[in-house]
Amino acid sequence: MKFSTLLIAAGLLCISVHITAQPHSRKKVGIVLSGGGAKGMAHIGALKVIEKAGIPIDYVVGTSMGSIIGGLYSIGYTPEQLDSMVRRQDWTFLLSDKIPRSEQNMAEREAAEKYVFSLPFGKDAKTQAIGGLIKGQNLANLFSELTVGYHDSIDFNKLPIPFACVSENIVNGNEVNFHKGVLATAMRASMAIPGVFTPVRLDSMVLVDGGVVNNYPVNVARAMGADIIIGVDVQSDLKPANELNSAGSILGQLINLM
């Protein structure tokens, strides 16, 4: 076990003792899960440690990947179920706009076998490119499948664990905090990385990744009523110029800047 994990566990144990020692006036605990791309999967491990320490969770707030893990946790998924779900996904397919082979016609199957990827051309190409390279429909479908029973517009404060997530409205640059709505839509909006995924259009708003404006939304958890904040920040240090030499490294840097 890494020293950092031991340190976290020790800190959580102290919090647990402090909370359980005051059963009649228990402090409210808020979990804050930052954005951070694929590193956001580390949130699952953090939730396991928090549960093992016996700490009650009263609120969950997340940005980007933190909104996905947090949103699913808030409706009852256990850390073990989340871990299993992440491991069994075909992420190459999910992070693309490919149509499942079973739903393709013959022409689409032939095109899929011929080209590794495609870019939009034609009169709508400029608009699509500005929006993002990936429409994210496969991810949206997954979120919809995982949130069965929560497809209607609902009050997130009435979920098994009250939840909120963060996005940005690029129409005016304002931060948008989702406390109600369709859960899958809120999660998709919170992780719409500019230039990578198309924005989510909702009412008069055009929504992108919440990491642009608030990648570590402690203030949102405080406003919900949390007295104690347990934050999980998985942002990475920025890379120097000589390490930004591939599309993947540049994309990772952009995510970390958010």
Mark where each language-model region is:
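Patatin-like phospholipase
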Residues: 20-63, 71-258
